[in-house]
Amino acid sequence: MIDENILREKAQKYIVCFNGECPLHDHCLRWQAGRYLPERLYSVYCFNPNHPGAATDNCPGFRTDQPQRIPRGMVHFYEAMPGKMERAIKARLIERYSRVTYYRYRRGEYPITPDVEQTILQACRDCGWTADPVYDSYNDELVW
């Protein structure tokens, strides 16, 4: 069970869902956060219940309430790569995420979510690096 204080905090600035008919709602962070919205808020961000994918087993807004193994930090990421390849990958990631965000990922300030991890992997493959990326650490975290 997720701490209620975390749900209250996240609910105020998170896209929530109110569709209790969705087959995934029992394990969806968005639905759980929606239950903890403060009454003082007049309006909130929520998913459109009329969207064709809403309330299906393939809901595009679904976020699991189970912690996932999330990498953090890329300080040692390039150690085994040739310098030319390192520069090419770094340039692609900065172009995609901005310099500030790239360095936040690199320092481990931001978790490397599954979609970011896929982008990093694709940048490595596009630049010719075939080994799996190595991150500084891995933590079990919720992916909001």
Regions found by a protein language model. Name each.
Residues F18, R92, Y110:
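Short, charged/polar micro-motifs that form catalytic or ligand-binding hotspots
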Residues M1-F62:
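N-terminal cysteine/histidine-rich coordination modules
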Residues R8-Q12, R69, M85, Y97, ...:
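Alpha-helix N-cap/N′ positions at the starts of helices
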Residues R63-R87, T130-Y135:
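A short, Lys/Arg-rich alpha-helix, primarily the initiator
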Residues S98-I112:
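Recognition helix of helix-turn-helix/homeodomain-like DNA-binding domains
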Residues M85-E95, Y102:
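Short alpha-helical "recognition helix" segments of helix-turn-helix
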Residues D115-P133:
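DNA major-groove recognition helix of helix-turn-helix/homeodomain DNA-binding modules
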Residues D3-A11, Y135-W144:
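Short, charged recognition helix plus adjacent turn
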